[in-house]
Amino acid sequence: MKKSTKKLCAIAALGTLFSSSLCLAAGPNANAASEGKWLSGDFHQHTLYTDGSTTFDFVMEKSNEFGLDWWANSEHGGGRNRDGNGVFWDTYIPNPILGNYAVSGGHQIMWRWQSLRDFVYPQILDTRSLYPERRAFSGFEWNVPGHEHCSTAIVAKDMAEDASAISAFEYQFDKSDKDTSRNSENTPYGTLTKTNVTHADAVTACQWMQDQYEDGGIDNAWIIFAHIERNGIAATGGYDVNDFRDFNNAGPDVAFGFEGAPGHQVNTFRGFGNALTCDENGVCISSEEDEPYDFGGTYGGVGYYTAEVGGLWDAMLGEGRRWFNFANSDYHKHYTAGGDDFYPGEYQKTWVYAVDKDGDGAYSYNEIADGMRSGNTYFAHGDLITHLEFEAQDNNRKASMGGELVADGAIKNLKIKITFKSPETNNCVADGTYISACAEPKVHHIDLIAGDITGLIDPEKEPEAYTDPTNPTTRVIATFAANSWETDKNGNNVIVYHLKDVDKSMYFRLRGTNLAPNTPDETDAVGNPLPDALVTRNQGIDGAQEAWNDLWFYSNPIFVYVK
């Protein structure tokens, strides 16, 4: 049986600050990174199987072309009427469709539990054969009961032939899957029960995945929530901070993060479908009367939950939660063909540090999934950086992203080391139509952001705190411009910063950009990102050009505990 952070949490029982932090820290990557390799990926993309506009094979080819080391086919649950080449299922002879009869667009649909198992997975196996150096995961975009969407994937026990686990998850828990034909079916994952209506059902789904992982029914999995601000608060179909806390409590080893930077980065609102309008004074409000301004568009291509210093993500981190941040393409249709998207890997990448645990010189699906869970990851726009090491050190104790450093008392001299590298060029191509000019990817400055860790919040004892999406202790404690770093013999930029007399538990995270503070309509006086809608309104710059002008990266946190 796998070591479960959930069981350790139960033992800690939300006691003191330190016992609470131990409960959350007992996962992978508790120390500095072991020998491994940085691998780039994208786990949210669409094909003709659902609402994408290009074939399955085309999207796999583009993922490879843009240099991704790994990716997941992750598209909507529910039911669809066509296959990955756009052929209607009911034109097959014989008709292969199983389950309850339903129609969409005049054609019979196939429920996703079947297409995932019987059609998509064989194509994933073909993809693995075609690109043996890459890793193509089996996943889907979960329509979360009571909420919006979520990227999921499972590494099955028998990867040569078995996609039944992801099929069982989709059938039971996807709110758009109305099929009832498999109710009471006995599977290796238990008896199937339809549980797909309420928030409580979504929590049960996370619990189910956690149980499968703990009990060895599956080798690995992730549940990472998608474009989290798009539908606003939970009352309008989105998410509140307490929802993420519930999911993480139920599945700490599988439900461990969200997409801080949504896909659809060529969209007018850099990923969101709801408008944010700004007046001549720069005051911005949502077009939806019942939603606050933070749900309209993005801030430097990043959602408000992540971009706001001291906001929702920082509230999660302030508990010491291993809750990590990722980015994807959410590719449906390329902007040059009338869509809102870059190809997978063309603009946004999630970088994962994978450890070669079995020493075979390759990186397995398990090792990549473990790397995501470890939190030793970061994401970047437009290849602003293609390498990042972020470490905290106290004497001989060291921790990297996602890890923890534990000190017996106050730390006299906490050493923060940042090592990063930018490429000479990225995938921007000036064509005179969509993009007039391309700047080299170059970091202007990096912010070191810190907040206090006060421990897990008990929803029964502190209900108001449990629903509070803020962390007022979070602040930018240092900003590093080009004169703050040196270049080593490998061409990496290196920053060393010392924090004296650390006498309380804190987390540290990074964000960096190619833009200077006070860049008109892009950043404020101290360098915080402004609403992307300002650039559209005031300068008329939109689409791909806006995205290539405005590049950011975000690290995941390091946790430092002082007893």
Question: What is the meaning of each model-derived region?
Answer:
Residues K2-I11:
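Bacterial N-terminal signal peptides that target proteins for export
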Residues I11-S21:
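Bacterial N-terminal signal peptides
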Residues A26-W38, H46, T50, F56-M60, ...:
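C-terminal functional module detector
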Residues G27-G237, A307, N328, T519-P520, ...:
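A metal-dependent hydrolase metal-coordination microenvironment
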Residues G77-D83, M159-D162, G260-D279, L515-D521:
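Short, solvent-exposed beta-strand-terminating loops
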Residues P145-A163, R230-F256, K333-Y353:
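Substrate-binding cleft/loops of secretory-pathway carbohydrate-active enzymes
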Residues T195-I224, G237-V254, A275-P292, Y304-G320:
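Histidine/acidic residue-rich metal-binding segments in metalloenzymes
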Residues H227-E229, P262, D356:
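Short, structured patches in soluble enzyme cores that scaffold and shape functional sites
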